[in-house]
Amino acid sequence: MSTPTPLSYKDAGVDIDAGNALVSNIKAAVKRTRRPEVMGNLGGFGALCELPTKYKQPVLVSGTDGVGTKLRLAIDYKKHDTVGIDLVAMCVNDLIVQGAEPLFFLDYYATGKLDVETATSVVNGIGEGCFQSGCALIGGETAEMPGMYEGEDYDLAGFCVGVVEKADIIDGSKVAAGDALIALASSGPHSNGYSLVRKVLEVSQADPQQDLNGKPLIQHLLEPTKIYVKSLLKLIEASDVHAMAHITGGGFWENIPRVLPENCKAVIQGDSWQWPAVFNWLMENGNIAEYEMYRTFNCGVGMIVALPADKVDAALALLAAEGEQAWLIGAIAPREGNEEQVEIL
């Protein structure tokens, strides 16, 4: 009987050395995001973080999300450096809705065969997103799983924890008829509706490299999700914000009602802003109904803020000073019976 060839983990498709190389590559990106509350260094079994001392009754707010099938486009067009920003944005923008300051972030990166260069690019993007939102990249998991993913495919998930003063939680309970609605511009489709985006590309047989308003269509589609955290934290501090809605999956129809009392509805002026060109392109080339556009995409509005009408001018000035494009988009009105909670006129 012959002696069998000795096997290693690498023979089975898992390269520990590649994982170690990745950790070495991302140290600078992680260090850049460090907050004073973080204890210890990258690589521990668990990540430690103190609560900021400025909070008297701190409440932790948690969230998790992914990038959806936008990853398919990013992988196909080898654009790996910004999907990490998307990942962070989808999580921290959800936290800021409740007034929470993001504290720390963890990521999960799964692939069939670890490509160190690709993974480094992705995690550096995560670090950039954390830096933009003032959030510490405190840890993560890189899972190399042969047989689970095809070719160069990978998947991402993000997990974020933030903190808000108990008395300052924003939950929509203060929303009342007469409140104004301010919209903050999106950078594009963000990270939602990409299964429909890909279907439009397929059905229309469009060239993703074709010019649209001076840059390739694919560049519009892969533009990273805008992170609103720092500008909205300043707005919360300076104004009386009653509610915020992050316009993600489900669009206007599903996200705005999540923060409204049952007796209120949002009345939005559809002509108060101009859709970015990419949404008009999708609507035309996919023959998508307007209702479906508002149900699937943000249509140029990444965040909506409800606040007293007499605070609008100051809020718009503050947001402009923070580099945000924002405008008055509508108002809160009384809701009668079983009326829809969102009207777009």
From Swiss-Prot:
Q: Which InterPro entries match?
A: PurM-like_C_dom, PurM-like_C_sf, PurM-like_N, PurM-like_N_sf, PurM_cligase
Q: What are the entry keywords?
A: ATP-binding, Cytoplasm, Ligase, Nucleotide-binding, Purine biosynthesis
Under the GO molecular function aspect, what terms does this record hold? ATP binding; phosphoribosylamine-glycine ligase activity; phosphoribosylformylglycinamidine cyclo-ligase activity
Any idea where this protein resides? Cytoplasm
Q: Please list the reactions this protein catalyses.
A: 2-formamido-N(1)-(5-O-phospho-beta-D-ribosyl)acetamidine + ATP = 5-amino-1-(5-phospho-beta-D-ribosyl)imidazole + ADP + phosphate + H(+)
Q: Which residues cross the membrane?
A: none
Primary site of residence: cytoplasm
Named in its record, the pathway it takes part in is: Purine metabolism; IMP biosynthesis via de novo pathway; 5-amino-1-(5-phospho-D-ribosyl)imidazole from N(2)-formyl-N(1)-(5-phospho-D-ribosyl)glycinamide: step 2/2
Q: Which Pfam families match?
A: AIRS, AIRS_C
Its BP terms in the Gene Ontology are: 'de novo' IMP biosynthetic process; adenine biosynthetic process
Q: What is its EC number?
A: 6.3.3.1
Cite the SUPFAM superfamilies for this sequence: PurM C-terminal domain-like, PurM N-terminal domain-like
GO cellular component terms given for this protein: cytosol
Give the PANTHER family listed for this entry: TRIFUNCTIONAL PURINE BIOSYNTHETIC PROTEIN ADENOSINE-3, TRIFUNCTIONAL PURINE BIOSYNTHETIC PROTEIN ADENOSINE-3-RELATED
Q: Which family does it belong to?
A: Belongs to the AIR synthase family.
Q: What is this protein called?
A: Phosphoribosylformylglycinamidine cyclo-ligase
Q: What gene name is given for the protein in this entry?
A: purM
